[in-house]
Amino acid sequence: MKKFRWVILIIVALVCLLLWAQVFNIMCDQDVQFFNGICAINKFIPW
C-alpha cells in the first residue's frame, strides 16, 4: 500500500512539473518582464 502511495505522489509531481513548463512557455511567448530571467534559465532546460 505504501509503494502505491509513492507512485501516486510521483505521478502528481510530474503532472505539476508539466503544467509549470506549459505556464512558463506561455509567459515566455508573451514576453512578460518578470519572467525574462526565468525564461533565460528555462531555455537551457530540455522540457
Curated annotation (Swiss-Prot):
What is the protein's given name?
PhoP/PhoQ regulator MgrB
* Entry keyword set: Cell inner membrane, Cell membrane, Membrane, Transmembrane, Transmembrane helix
Q: Which family does it belong to?
A: Belongs to the MgrB family.
Q: Which species does this protein come from?
A: Citrobacter koseri (strain ATCC BAA-895 / CDC 4225-83 / SGSC4696)
The record's disulfide annotation reads: none
Q: What does this protein do?
A: PhoP-regulated transcription is redox-sensitive, being activated when the periplasm becomes more reducing. MgrB acts between DsbA/DsbB and PhoP/PhoQ in this pathway. Represses PhoP/PhoQ signaling, possibly by binding to the periplasmic domain of PhoQ, altering its activity and that of downstream effector PhoP.
Membrane topology of this protein: Single-pass membrane protein
Q: Which domain of life is it from?
A: Bacteria
Q: Which gene encodes it?
A: mgrB
Primary site of residence: membrane
Q: Where in the cell is it found?
A: Cell inner membrane
Recorded GO CC terms = plasma membrane
The protein's matches in NCBIfam families, at most eight in alphabetical order, are given as:
PRK10299.1
